[in-house]
A protein has these predicted regions:
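Short beta-strand edge/turn micro-motifs at domain boundaries
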Residues: 110, 120-125, 132-177
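Short C-terminal domain-edge/linker segments immediately following a structured domain
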Residues: 60-61, 69-72, 164-170
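Surface-exposed, charged secondary-structure patches
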Residues: 63-142
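Hydrophobic membrane-insertion alpha-helices, especially the h-region
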Residues: 2-20
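Alpha-helical transmembrane signal-anchor/signal-peptide segments
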Residues: 22-37
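Short extracytoplasmic
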Residues: 35-65
């Protein structure tokens, strides 16, 4: 009976610790410029699809708000947004959410050159369901920077990043100089 309880305790500890180990592997992939490891740990097609849907929804929602404030100009703007926004969002996300783009990001390159871990960027990390784990990221050097939430799910026997939740457009755009 003791062995069974010990085995159960070890399995639970391994299960609870595994997503944190995955965060460590992500950190190491970024620091070592390891594209293959990053591709194993992040489901890039899924992340891009989710991010495109989220960003397109935010852009169209903003266009609808403008239409309510300025009916004539807003109607034209909303129609134009519906026509142009999907292509702009898709091409932007496709260009920015790739292993190559992430590994060549200036912040990532700077940390890699200094051999500094990205652990400081994580402000929260915990389970939201038995097979779902989230972690919040924020630039520690910029206290007013927006928080981005990454979502990991248990895919077979490994944890993978499958989504990213970004703050509302107003918050993102207010930080642009």
């Amino acid at each position: 009976m003791r062995r069974l309880l010990l085995l159960l305790a070890i399995l639970i500890a391994a299960y609870v610790g595994y997503p944190y180990l995955t965060l460590y592997w992500l950190d190491q992939a970024l620091l070592n410029d390891d594209q293959e490891a990053l591709e194993r740990l992040v489901d890039f097609p899924q992340v891009r699809a989710d991010l495109k849907a989220e960003m397109q929804g935010q852009v169209l929602e903003k266009a609808a708000e403008i239409k309510e404030k300025r009916p004539i100009l807003g109607t034209f703007g909303q129609a134009l947004t519906k026509l142009v926004a999907p292509g702009l969002v898709d091409s932007s996300v496709d260009g920015m959410v790739t292993p190559e783009a992430i590994l060549s990001n200036p912040t990532v390159v700077e940390h890699r050159e200094k051999n500094e871990s990205f652990v400081d960027f994580i402000t929260y990390a915990f389970f939201t369901a038995p097979a779902r784990f989230i972690f919040d990221l924020k630039d520690p050097e910029k206290p007013d920077s927006p928080t981005v939430t990454a979502i990991m799910t248990l895919d077979g026997f490994r944890w993978r990043v499958v989504g990213v939740e970004v703050p509302p457009l107003e918050q993102l755009l207010s930080k642009v100089p």
